[in-house]
């Protein structure tokens, strides 16, 4: 929530002060040809950069929009764009046939909270498009390794009072929302395929860049609905990119791995918001929020702490601690932290108006009820 608000404010302060991909060409001899879906998103853009830095040839695919075309002009050397709508099976078949990748890193998805407001689109992208991509990959003359982005949402609601241990790969899968259910479906599709596969279940991905995440009323409302004492295991997006890049070649075929930061990233929901606000020069701007009900297994969100030992051993991706991220955020904001104090009251009122429990009765958070009231039904439907 704070990342979005701060992004808007910093952009304002800055103002006060101050290709289409052709058919894949001859790239020469390099390690792998990696197709990255959703390659212009938060995780995708960092993953593309890391793959190129590691010496791979990268083909980035995403929807053909003006914003994506503009982003494509900044792709690094040894990366190029190939536009495709993954919900169109014919375009998927053409994409995979023309690129002929040795590895597919599948990041394209409708994530939260947009998936709640657009459930049919979310299923087409998260499930149907993934299934089409898997079929096209299996039909390739040289089937690629398939690295799938999944989520800790597959485990469902997590009451830390009743579940004190960290989540493990073999913890029961009990998705509580449609996004988690979608990820369970595509994980199973991938395991049932004939492809060499790797699944990475991600924790709470955060960027140090103020403008990295979109600013929307839905996002503010959504984040304010989460229990303030809910556990969340954050991770720097650059470390997520490092994990995906490593997974393209590491000896982890057939493994599911949990991707989150080192132990400094074992946080509570409220801690994250307060720390991000302070790093950007904003204090006392968060609405009070509500804790989760310790006697309920349902009224909690789908985040928790993860056992990342095996993933770190295999992929060696944890490079940015939580304190280091906060220090970097302060450095990026620099002198602008000081005038931020003057806009604090405006930000406070903005967040208060978007708060999920404003004027609502009750003591404890009800994330699913709040989400349902504004964004739509979050629970899995029968097709999930």
Language-model regions, residue ranges each:
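NAD(P)-dependent short-chain dehydrogenase/reductase
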Residues: 188-234, 238-239, 273-277
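Mid/C-terminal beta-alpha module of Rossmann-like enzyme folds, strongest
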Residues: 243-314, 320, 324-328, 336-345, ...
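NAD(P)H-binding glycine-rich loop region in Rossmannoid oxidoreductase-like domains
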Residues: 83-125, 156
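Glycine-rich NAD(P)-binding loop of the Rossmann-fold in SDR/ketoreductase-type enzymes
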Residues: 87, 117, 121-132, 173, ...
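N-terminal Rossmann NAD(P)H-binding glycine-rich loop of SDR-like oxidoreductase domains
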Residues: 34-54
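Conserved glycine-rich Rossmann-like NAD(P)H-binding loop of the short-chain dehydrogenase/reductase
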Residues: 56-68
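Active-site Tyr-X1-5-Lys
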Residues: 160, 174-198
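Conserved Rossmann-fold NAD(P)-dependent oxidoreductase catalytic core, especially the SDR/UDP-sugar
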Residues: 131-178
């Amino acid at each position: 929530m704070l990342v979005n608000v701060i992004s808007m404010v910093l952009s304002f302060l800055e103002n006060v002060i101050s290709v289409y991909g052709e058919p894949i060409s001859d790239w020469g001899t390099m390690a792998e040809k990696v197709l990255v879906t959703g390659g212009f998103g938060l995780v995708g853009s960092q993953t593309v950069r890391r793959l190129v830095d590691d010496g791979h040839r990268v083909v980035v695919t995403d929807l053909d929009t003006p914003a994506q075309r503009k982003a494509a002009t900044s792709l690094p050397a040894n990366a190029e764009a190939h536009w495709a709508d993954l919900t169109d099976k014919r375009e998927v078949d053409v994409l995979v046939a023309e690129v002929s990748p040795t590895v597919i890193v599948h990041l394209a998805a409708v994530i939260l909270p947009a998936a709640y407001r657009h459930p049919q689109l979310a299923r087409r992208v998260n499930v149907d498009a993934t299934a089409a991509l898997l079929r096209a990959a299996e039909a390739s003359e040289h089937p690629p390794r398939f690295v799938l982005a999944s989520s800790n949402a597959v485990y469902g609601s997590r009451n830390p009072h009743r579940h004190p241990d960290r989540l493990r790969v073999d913890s029961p899968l009990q998705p509580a929302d449609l996004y988690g259910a979608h990820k369970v479906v595509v994980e199973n599709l991938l395991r049932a395929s004939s492809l060499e596969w790797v699944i990475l279940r991600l924790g709470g991905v955060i960027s140090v860049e103020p403008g990295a995440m979109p600013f929307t009323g839905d996002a503010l409302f959504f984040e304010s609905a989460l229990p303030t004492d809910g556990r969340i295991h954050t991770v720097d997006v650059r470390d997520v990119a490092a994990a995906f890049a490593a997974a393209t070649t590491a000896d982890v075929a057939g493994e599911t791995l949990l991707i989150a930061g080192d132990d400094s990233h074992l946080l509570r929901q409220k801690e994250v918001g307060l720390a991000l606000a302070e790093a950007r020069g904003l204090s006392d701007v968060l609405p009070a929020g509500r804790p989760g009900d310790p006697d309920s297994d349902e009224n909690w969100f789908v985040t928790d702490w993860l056992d990342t030992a095996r993933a770190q051993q295999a992929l060696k991706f944890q490079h940015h601690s939580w304190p280091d991220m906060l220090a970097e955020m302060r450095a990026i904001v620099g002198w602008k932290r000081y005038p931020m104090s003057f806009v604090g009251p405006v930000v406070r009122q903005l967040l208060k108006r978007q708060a999920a429990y404003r004027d609502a009765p009750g003591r404890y958070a009800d994330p699913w009820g709040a989400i349902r009231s504004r964004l739509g039904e979050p629970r899995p439907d029968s097709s999930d």
